[in-house]
Amino acid sequence: METRDRKARNFIQTNFQALLWHGLPVAALVIWGAFCITNNLWYDEAYSASMVSLPWKRLIYITATDDHSPFYYVLLKLFYHLCGGGTHFWALKLMSVLFMLGYMLLGKYYVAKLFDRKISVYFMTFSLLMPIFSVQAGNVRMYAVALFFLTLTGLSAYDIFREATGKKWIVFCLASICTVYCHTFALIQTFLFYGLFLFTILICRKKELIRGFLISGFTVAIVFSPWLAVTCRQFILRMRYDDGSTAELATLNSVMDYCKEWFSAVETPIGIVVLLGIALCLVLSYGAVDWVRQHGNAAPAIGAATFALTGIVGGVISATINNCFMGRYAFPGMGFVMLWYAVGFAQLVENAGEKSRKWWIAGTLGTAGLCFVLQYTSEIHLEYDQGLETYENFIETEVTENDAIIGPYTHTIFLNVYHPKLHYYLVGYKLYSLPFANTEALMEYSQLNSYENVWYICFKGGEPDPMEDGYNYEVELEFHYMYYDFVIYRLEPKTIEDARAQRSKPT
């Protein structure tokens, strides 16, 4: 009777595991797909949307003077125009979701091939439940693309280590090239991973792999070398001229910001999610260390070390040279962390007794599930925020094509991505690499003489102080949108009487 019950339990577990193995990528597509339906963009996403709206030559020029290579923007621009273009940017979000789906399929097939289906299911489960994946899934930035290619790089490296073939080396090399062209810190992660991979080859005396490794490494270096020169020049210029990133270097408080972003979200952190995420990481790391020791397989540890070293390198650079690192810059290596979590969870479940196993599973997955629900709900509220509709209604009813909209600095005018044909000005200075359309520097009031109405948009608490010499102002609209509280003022030119009255005021 006991044997029959055990067989029944094994049958149920096997079929449930098969159901999860097939169903988790579909669930991810549905859950993350909710982020690509709306048209809400925050500043960095609006920057990407403006980039893909530019002519090809201008796009390449800006990437050569900004922080990132054109690789991601080229992919995004092609996909954007393939989906019809326009000012509804669902296609931009969809591309990130599709690369996240590709990452899940790597977990389904490649992780299952290299480990087993159980590890594959755990890998996909934690990938779906970790809050940072919900934050980045629909983000119109290069992080999802870099996640896919760096994960492919790592898995193909382990596949080569087990049994090298020419095709595997080609996949490894191509994935590495795509990764280094995604983001500067994806480049750093790839370099660190290559170093650890070479160290492993030498320690394990796999001399037959050295030739392929060197060929792949030199190929990646040669292909990336033109942009490496650009990257170095950008970094030097930023150190020389960007006072904000050199005067305020990273401190211990910055480590907390990194943790907020890795375990929750830096803009909208949820305290309990951060704390539970750190606790979960410690528990699963304990199991992962035991798994590596018991199986004599250091592959998950090498991946986790790559992620950890990226955080350390980024933190050291930000604390000593230039405050340029943010937690999400390490996101491309999160696939390595999820593999670390997966083997750790498998080991904890395997080592647990019959009675305590259910508690381990329920406690671990319940904690991860709670973090997911809290963060996912927060992200959905942001994604479906109605502030954009308020702004669109205002533009439609109050603003004409012969109006000018002024902002005190770049972050206040990114909403122009929705109305690129209107006229925009930045007070006093415009960055040469700014991609937003029809945006100029406002140097003198005479530039505004031909406009029917003049508007000033800033964040709540700000006022049109730079314009008060020549204009009176009054609040026309206050609205909240995603992370921002905006105020729009109507500016009216001062009359001679207004100027006299202002001069007569006591100072």
Regions from the language model: what does each represent?
Residues F16, L20-E350, W360-E492:
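Membrane-proximal helix-loop-helix interfaces that form the catalytic/acceptor-binding platform
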